[in-house]
Amino acid sequence: KYNNQERISVYVKQLDTDRVAAINDEKSMYAASVAKLGVLYYAQERLSQKKLSLSDEYQYTSAVNGFPGAYDPDGSGKISKMPDDKNYSLENLLKAVAQNSDNVATNILGYYVTNQYDKAFQKSVDKAAATSWNMDKKELTARAAGTLMEAVYRQNGDIINYLSSTDYDGERTSKNIDVPVAHKIGDAYDFKHDVAIVYADSPF
């Protein structure tokens, strides 16, 4: 069915049976904004543990765009590309990442919430994704992305709800589908990604 299969990577899991269908699902490639799922997962984990509150605020200083693994602030998103020293709530930052794929919001969360992708973050997300989640090079496999998306779904928190209403619901997995979809896209260069939970009966 798929021509030129070396240029694609597909991982599909039926969550109620654990059955998997895949093509090149262990092929590592530049994941772009799909890597932001790691930040969203970790923030939700800490929210569930009551270590964070949605009302918590973080200041947008120049430092948040300058640590290893930070996204280019000139990329996607609506928050000011230049540091404004304003405080942003955790709730608004998470919505900005999940719904607008905001690079600056990701950097603010990465700087403060994950402590610049420290060992605690890495250990937590690696365990959830069942592999090393690389926030520096942002190279991931379809299987890793799908596995972490399933973990976000299993958390059953605010994040999966935010991902169910995004700026990108008219494209990729959610395009022309009449069932709810929670998804995170990621584009860069020739890479066009999407990782999603499709709320449908099986088979779909």
Label the predicted regions:
Residues 170-204:
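Short, Gly/Ser/Thr-enriched beta-strand-loop segments that form substrate-interacting elements
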Residues 15-17, 26-28, 45, 63-65, ...:
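Solvent-exposed coil/turn segments that connect beta secondary-structure elements
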Residues 1-24, 197-198:
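A short, well-structured edge-of-sheet supersecondary motif
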Residues 18, 30-58, 97:
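Active-site SXXK
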Residues 62-74, 163-176:
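Short, mixed-charge aromatic SLiMs
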Residues 22-29, 94, 134-135:
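A short glycine/serine-rich beta->alpha loop
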Residues 6-8, 17-19, 54-56, 141-144, ...:
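Envelope-exposed proteins and targeting segments
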